[in-house]
Each structure stands twice: as structure tokens, then as C-alpha cells.
Amino acid sequence: MKKLISVALAGVMALGLAACGSTPASEPASGSTAASAAYGSSAASASASTESKQYIFSVDDLTGKTIGVQLGTTGDTYAQDIEGATVEQYNKFNDAVLALKQGKVDAVIIDNEPGKVFDEQNDDIIMLDEDFTVEDYAIALNKGSELTEKFNEAIAAIKENGTMDAILDKYINGVEGAEGYVTPEGTEYPNGTLTMATNAYFPPYEYYEGDEIVGIDAEFAKAICDYLGYELKIEDMEFASIIPAINSGKADFGAAGMTVTEERLLNVDFTDSYCTGIQSVLVLK
């Protein structure tokens, strides 16, 4: 599921952002725990709207509230365990934040770094000072993949030679003039191409800059592939489709601020952790 200053993105909320599914923007994803709450029952909608005007001060205040999440993320899992909470699942964080602004949910559980971007781009929402939880990010690969050991070797080297620090300086630490990772001149790719599955609406980990997918995971994956002699191809898809894409062979690995969970380990293997993330909470001011 994804994480110190935010990337300056023009119109983060307008990243409208091409969806792979057919769910309209701001409409809960199919299978939402309470999909009818915002669209079917006027009474439920009125209740959510009323609740969303309350200022939520802490994680404890989420009890009994309507919470927006991105489908398939660890935030989705955490929200299900909040006492008395109604969980609204969305295909993109953008849609969950829009629902918050419209009063359809009371709060959004989101990874810290993307949450900061939404916070800074919207005057009517704020991130709670209290962290919801802390977690580690890793890259997902098919069960038993020979790439896992190779990726771990590359990750260790990239951390040791300062490449990871350079990427974080560019996207998170706000170091002026930081270039991140740049492919060394003369790099060759004798081993073919690897396809990375991601959900490119998760700044600063992955997002669109024009037609190009950029961000921490994109540069980190490029550094790994360069180290191992592979070209990198990035495929954008719904977050919940990443693991199925890996299992089906459509993608060789997945990187999208993914947290290692017992449920995910049933279907994929994970590399060593490359970054620590925080789950945070967005609410209306």
C-alpha cells in the first residue's frame, strides 16, 4: 500500500489522470464497502456531509467516521479495522481527496508524501500531525523469481554508492540542484527489457510529468535496471491490478510505494526494503 517537502506539481488534483477502469472520477470503485453511501441514499450522504464538517484532531477521532481510501492499499486494510468506520474505496487517491472536499467522506488515509502534496495544493484540507502508522516499502516480484536476488544485490549497491540518497534529495529532501539518478554514459542493456507495473498518481513516488512517468520509484527502478543491464519499461495501471499483472507475466515487477503485508506475500515475493513510509490522515479544515 506508499512517503521532506513535496514535489511542486501543477494541478495535482487535475491529474485526472487516465484511469484503466470505467469508474467515473470521484465515484467509489466497484466493490466499495459502502458505495451507496455517497450516491444511493440521500440520508447517508447528508450524514457524511455533516460529519465531514467536524474537525478531526487525532487518529482516535476516526472511530465511527466515513473514511476514503485507495482500493487495495494498506490504508484500505487499516481503515477496515477502525471501529464503526464506513470505508469508501476509490481507484485513485485523487478521487478519495475529491470526495473529502465534497463532504462525502470525513477523512482519507493516505501515504505521507502524497498526502503532503494534496495538503499543500488544497487550502480546505489538512494533514493530521499524528501518524497513522509507519511501514517499509519494497519491490514486488513473482513468487520464486530469479530477479529477486539480483534486485536485492542492486538495491544494496544503490544504497551504498549514494544513488538512493541522491534520488531522495531530489524528490523529498528538497536539496537545491539535486539531479537524482542519471543513467551513466555508455550504459548497455545486454539482458533485454524489464516491465515495471505502477500506479502513476502517487507523487512523489510516481506521477506524470507531461507524458513521462517520473518520481522516486521510477528513478530507483531505472537505477536498478541500469545496474543489471536491462532496459526499463513502465506500465501505468490501477493499484489493485499491479500484483495480478506480475502474476500473469504482463509485468516483471511492481513498484508503487508498496508495503510488505502477509496477504500480498501469498501472491508475490518482495525485495529488501528500500524506503520507509508513513500512513497519514487528511481531513477538512
Show where each model-derived region lies:
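Extended ligand-binding regions for polar small-molecule ligands
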Residues: 23, 73, 135-177, 219-222, ...
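Extracytoplasmic/secreted envelope proteins and their assembly/folding machinery
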Residues: 56-59, 72-80, 94-97, 101, ...
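Periplasmic-binding protein-like
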Residues: 116-153, 181-183, 187, 200, ...
